Amino acid sequence: MTTYRRMTLCDTLQFNFVNLDQLTETYNTSFYGEYVTHWPEYQRMCVHPTTNIPMAYTLGKAEGQGEDYHGHVSAVSVAPTFRRVALGETLMAELAQMSELVHNAYFVDLFVRKSNQVAQDMYHRLGYIVYRTVLNYYHGDGPKGPFKSDEDALDMRLALRRDKERRKSSVIPLDRPIKPEELEWV
């Protein structure tokens, strides 16, 4: 059993256990604060119902303009102890639903390391497609870090109902990789 609820800024002081994975992107307090205050409906937590221990969370936002208005997943992370029980999938479904029903977005997008096959498999199960590759999107940690060199990201997208209204679908893959400076939303 799990309790799903809106994230608060105080939660950021308690979810280090969720962020232990080297594949989880972590941010500074002001970044989390910006998300919690500007897009509170997108910030979701899973906590253990009896211990209140953070189990998983998502960070998201609405961005873009016109036909590029979309939901964006900045982070989804599940604590190692609580993996393989669909917490990430449930949070991702909530984020897509929020993007569609509250924000009337055209699609949801996210970036994932090319080497993170487990996450890619989950996103594919949820209906996401690889829209494009962003070359050297993730910066390496150097010789002593877990990621020695820069790594490409896959920009994955999930079309929402409103995508049918676009002149060109948001999920037709690009035929070439791009550089980070070519991204529309920075």
Curated annotation (Swiss-Prot):
Species whose genome carries this gene: Leishmania donovani
Described purpose of this protein according to its UniProt entry: Seems to be involved in N-acetylation.
Keyword presence, Transferase: yes
Protein name: N-terminal acetyltransferase complex ARD1 subunit homolog
Pfam families tied to this protein: Acetyltransf_1 (PF00583)
Entry GO CC: NatB complex
Enzyme class: transferase
Keyword list, A-Z: Acyltransferase, Transferase
Record-listed E.C. numbers: 2.3.1.-
GO MF annotations in UniProt: protein-N-terminal amino-acid acetyltransferase activity
UniProt xrefs under PANTHER family: N-ALPHA-ACETYLTRANSFERASE 20
Superkingdom, taxonomy of origin: Eukaryota
Keyword Magnesium in record: no
Domain N-acetyltransferase: 2-161
Homology family: Belongs to the acetyltransferase family. ARD1 subfamily.
Family matches, as InterPro entries: Acyl_CoA_acyltransferase, GNAT_dom, NatB_acetyltransferase_subunit
Encoding gene per record: ARD1
